[in-house]
Amino acid sequence: MQVSVETTEGLGRRVNITVAADTIEQAVKSELVNVAKKVCIDGFRKGKVPMNIVAQRYGASVRQDVLGDLMQRNFVDAIIQEKINPVGAPNYVPGEYKTGEDFSYAVEFEVYPEVELMGLDTIEVEKPRVEVKDADVDTMLDTLQKQQADWKETTDAAGAEDRVTVDFTGTIDGEAFDGGKATDFVLAMGQGRMIPGFEEGVIGHKAGESFDISVTFPEDYHAENLKGKAAKFAVELKKVEQRELPELDEAFIKRFGVADVSLEGLRAEVRKNMERELKNAVRNRVKTQVIDGLLNANDIHVPAALVDGEIDVLKRQAAQRFGGNEKQALELPRELFEEQAKRRVKVGLLLGEVIRKHELKADEARVSALIEEMASAYEDPKEVIEFYGKNKELMDNMRNVALEEQAVEALLANSRVTEKETGFNELMNQPSAA
């Protein structure tokens, strides 16, 4: 077997392989002998068919199978010989084959990038210093009351926290546009669901009134044809409703399954949940900064095959979030997921090198702690812990989480870390890209 390796573009490689004619012929003869032992042909006993007849009837298909097998086996031998680590499925490019002659073919594929970690001491992290204060618990209790509130129709003018039912028709330069019309549209004010200016235009009006609202679509609006466009909405306000907040009494507290149905018991349970969320938020905020710093210091090429695979994963996750239509999700434009997929692949490759460099292995005590922390949010934590312990896939996933945390901590040890006083709501409203 003769082997040569070419670099095509970026991480692309092309291995050229030539298989000697006698190697092919020996393999064909050997396979024909195996076939002769199994075939049944009229006029001959099984296993007694003359080889020339076996070759005449099965030679072409056997030769084709042998060539396919040799191509795969020789490719494996070639990448072992050349110490190549391919990514994804290879593309075989067979050359012209003539009986009795050497056979040449090529295999095209991508390889993993060579990762050399750089700039780890330049990573800067601003760690939030934050605690759950009594005022934060008060705000959360207010939120819980609003979530459990009933709505009562009113003749008052619409306010910033009311719920309204409207009909509207939007136009741009006098022309209607797709998605610009709705009937009996229920809008809870103050949640930022509508484009800027729409809710403000509703405030102060009463049920039964009709009016126009002028707005401008944001430059980053998701619909390309509407970005930055000025629009007018003709609105009919059909109903205004105000919240009726429940009392913070025993009946209200029982809705949340709290053992101690006093207000103090509810506050304690709310605080415990907020502190758990806060711990995760601080951890995620630090992780995001570490990952961002790692990516900024190490701009690596990523194999397209890995990006494609990650895009498929993201599409399936999108399907699970929005109704489970996987077929429809897989048809979504790849551009929607490409940047996130590239980031994930880069992070995986870089953290993989951190793990290799530091010879990290998942800390089983950390794995157990992560499972216990996650299980504490459920009604029966013990049952959840036992379920994880019996499920190898879930345990492996949690070990990967632990290992990733350990890699981030290894990076954090060499990072420039400062602390910043931060409010609970400020931290919880910060996005996390990691």
From Swiss-Prot:
Domain PPIase FKBP-type positions: 161-246
Keywords, sorted A to Z: Cell cycle, Cell division, Chaperone, Cytoplasm, Isomerase, Rotamase
Top EC group: isomerase
Compartments reported by the entry: Cytoplasm
Domain comment (free text): Consists of 3 domains; the N-terminus binds the ribosome, the middle domain has PPIase activity, while the C-terminus has intrinsic chaperone activity on its own.
Gene Ontology MF terms in the entry: peptidyl-prolyl cis-trans isomerase activity; protein folding chaperone; ribosome binding
Cystine crosslinks: none
Family: Belongs to the FKBP-type PPIase family. Tig subfamily.
Chain's role: Involved in protein export. Acts as a chaperone by maintaining the newly synthesized protein in an open conformation. Functions as a peptidyl-prolyl cis-trans isomerase.
Protein's name according to its UniProt entry: Trigger factor
Keyword Cell division appears in the UniProt entry: yes
Example GO biological process: cell division
Catalytic activity: [protein]-peptidylproline (omega=180) = [protein]-peptidylproline (omega=0)
Gene Ontology cellular component list: cytoplasm
UniProt cross-references to InterPro entries, sorted A to Z: PPIase_dom_sf, PPIase_FKBP_dom, Trig_fac, Trigger_fac_C, Trigger_fac_C_sf, Trigger_fac_ribosome-bd_bac, Trigger_fac_ribosome-bd_sf, Trigger_fact/SurA_dom_sf
Enzyme Commission no: 5.2.1.8
